Amino acid sequence: SGGSLGNIPITVAADAYWNPLGPTLLADGSVNPNRLPGLVGVPDEGLPVTIRSLNYVDAGMKTVNVTNYQYRFLGGLRGSFGDWNWESAGLYTWATVKDVMDGTSSTLLQAAINKTTPDAYNPFNGGCVDTPSVGDCTVNDPSVIDSFRIQSTRRNKTTLALWDLKISNANLLDLWGGNSIGIASGVEFRRETYKDDRDPRQGGVAGVDITYTDAVTGIFYGSDLMGASPSPDVSGRRKVWSAYAELAIPLVSPEMEIPMIRSFDIQVAGRYESYSDVGDVAKPKIAASWDLLQGFRLRGSWSQGFRAPNLEVLNTATLDRVNGGTEYVLCEADLRAGRISSFAECARSVSVLRRSGGNPDLKPEESTSWNFGAVFQPPLPDGMGQVTFTVDRWRIKQKGVVGLLDYQNALNLDYLLRVQGSSNPAVVRREPTADDIALVAGTGLEPVGELLYVTAPFQNLLPIQVDGIDFNLDYRVTTSSFGSFGLNVNAARLIKYQIDAPAAVQAVIDAQADGTINAAVPVSGGGDVVNRDGQPRWRISGNLTWDYGPVRIGAFTQFISDVYQNDVFDAAGNNFVVDGQTTVNLYATYKFDQGMMKGTAITIGARNIFDKNPPLASSGYLSSLYQPQARYWYTSIKKSF
């Protein structure tokens, strides 16, 4: 089924047949049986009703058919001359996706609702007078439902054409002790294209697409596809030239027998890329590894990197999306007027339309990173297998990360500026009504009009620094009687995730500190976000396998530590904590190695074997961390030729 968006409402006309606030008399002069009795303040001609959030369940389930094709053509040559090896290849690949989905037309739905005869669609049905939570005594006729059901189609295509030339020489220059400097370098050209063709009912462009204008209010909303914000077609292309080089320099080798330096290697590399749309960029890298003893290695690296903005964020015209937010300026009015005693009682939730768009002036994201660590492979007695333990401490600093200023931060800044007597121009509102004026009367605040949308174009944001430490344990052993066993455990600890606050966010933080606005307003997009929302401090996973002839049995487990929700508080002002979770998957595989079934592997498995629910959060669960699927079994057959 499908539901409406809060920012694209359906207005039920005053004279619509099923309007519970409709006229006292129908068009034929008979008494309106659908007008609620005992209404006060509702005129005889009735009043319109605005539907902002309703799931039209009797419209049936949505079926989505996805057709995906991928093609790849690759050809190349390789050869050598002297100590040099070379390789050149050409590649062309493209992928197409077609999504066909059942949907609802807002225009046709409103027309069906606003009929003045009994064959109108009734959005207020469900339940019965005597049993309101059971059954439906006012079922809509299927032909009425069919009048506004549609199918929407979205087509997407990407292409990549690439040519490259690589050369390498493992003995470019002789060094002491029989060592040699090796080199690898190359050039590359690629052409990328992207096209996203939305359904005409979702494009939102007047005169081009099938759009929705509320027939009662006359307000233009763009998208006629219910539950979908306006999304125009997007297309873009770019050409990229790149070149790279890498030197491998072995300064010390085991044959040199230097105490405490079994080997010492250095890697020096660099890469340059020239984009037709975002300019040029060049970045270096240096890495080193030092084997003190056999089985014990220290390693480290320092590098700079970059990532170009994708074609969608560069070329999108206007992109509307709806999220839930809170109007804290109205909470301030409620607090000053005595309607609430604290912000914990605030109930000013609102649907926020975020209006973003592509930005052709975006620059590549840039990063500087380092890591150092150790690898320990202690010798074990014969028959005991091999164990490897690694630990790596790392840091990544990013600048110019492509993103959007959070819509709630824009509302928070509007709250601050309105307390100071102005407003945030990125927050667009209607002119205040009489009710809006009455709401702030006596509070010292200026009237606040209904929220229309928040503008938030893609931009290069301020720096981010992420620190962490990774641990890995890998153990393998093969026995003569019981097959082979493998154990791998990974643990990642997030130490720091510092986001430099944009000016708008920092202004809110400072205003909270000096008491200008309420300190209970949650602020995102600034500070250290470890343990907050989607950034748990610990992630641990383990994989255990047993191989015996053609049989493999395996188990996988994953643990994610708890986090707190930045925008959810209890009455004491404490953040709501979302519990951690551990899940387990099991599988068994049988691989045939002879006969007609040779190369065939059959797998039976179960994911989330203990049927764990995702931990409770304010939105149900945190989709960025957890999967909602219950325990389920699966089987697969794979054939290798």
Task: Outline where the language-model segments fall.
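Outer-membrane beta-barrel translocator domains and adjoining extracellular loop/strand segments
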Residues: 2, 69, 99-105, 196-202, ...
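Residues that define the transmembrane beta-barrel architecture of outer-membrane proteins
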Residues: 67-71, 159-161, 237-243, 280-282, ...
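Short loop/turn motifs that connect adjacent beta-strands in outer-membrane beta-barrel proteins
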Residues: 79-86, 170-181, 252-264, 295, ...
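Surface-exposed, low-complexity loop segments enriched in small/polar and acidic residues
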Residues: 1-240, 254, 303, 307-364, ...
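C-terminal beta-signal and adjacent terminal beta-strands/loops
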Residues: 108, 388, 399, 495-498, ...
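Transmembrane beta-strands of outer-membrane beta-barrel pores
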Residues: 81-83, 92-98, 171, 187-195, ...
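Transmembrane beta-strands of outer-membrane beta-barrel proteins
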Residues: 1, 86-88, 181-187, 243, ...
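C-terminal beta-barrel architecture of Gram-negative outer-membrane proteins
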Residues: 321, 490-596
